[in-house]
């Protein structure tokens, strides 16, 4: 009986072809920029990422991906960052942004050997956390963005036109600061309702104990929703 010879067909998958970073583009960081998120005007933001170890080494490439470029890596002005060896930073200026929109983004940095890291901006004021955000109830905070499909781990955010807050008392001053009796208060664990309204209902209790000042703990993002915020992030 006969046996047919094997035949092979070469297929190229262009849709899922691996991204190849371009050659490093060098340029000085624009004047007056600081590390992190720099708001330039109502439609422009400059991102600056420090990357230099104790030996002066740095990664071979750095890109940014986010809502502003549909989480797409590319070797153009929408994704590839410039390198400035004098400052030890990568940077990119993003234009054509919506001042009232909150954007999620990450840095994509790595080496020619294949090491890749997805980073949130260390100076962001708000993060998206795929592991812990689901445990934050709407009654606690209902303005979180939906975690992006293109994100990996912690994702940073920015908004050009930040929401303003109108203070009810603009002339408040602490009388006799040397006489303060400060109570460190964590809203979640202080009352059964775990919110500021519950704490306000207990002000008379604190006053009876001689407390005349409250320090809310904490007021910033911290690691782990069940923590009190003392552990470092």
Spans of features found by a protein language model:
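Exposed beta-strand face motif in extracellular beta-rich ectodomains
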Residues: 1, 101-105
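Aromatic-rich, solvent-exposed beta-strand/loop patch
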Residues: 166-186
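Aromatic-rich carbohydrate-binding modules that target alpha-glucans
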Residues: 47-102, 110-134
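Aromatic-lined carbohydrate-binding/catalytic grooves of carbohydrate-active enzymes
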Residues: 206-233
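Non-catalytic, glycine-rich low-complexity segments
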Residues: 2-58, 142-148, 172
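Extracellular/periplasmic catalytic domains that process cell-envelope and extracellular macromolecules
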Residues: 55-57, 98-99, 174-181, 207-209
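Core domains of carbohydrate- and sulfate-ester-processing enzymes
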Residues: 105, 109, 114-169
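A conserved hydrophobic secondary-structure block that centers on an alpha-helix together
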Residues: 186-214
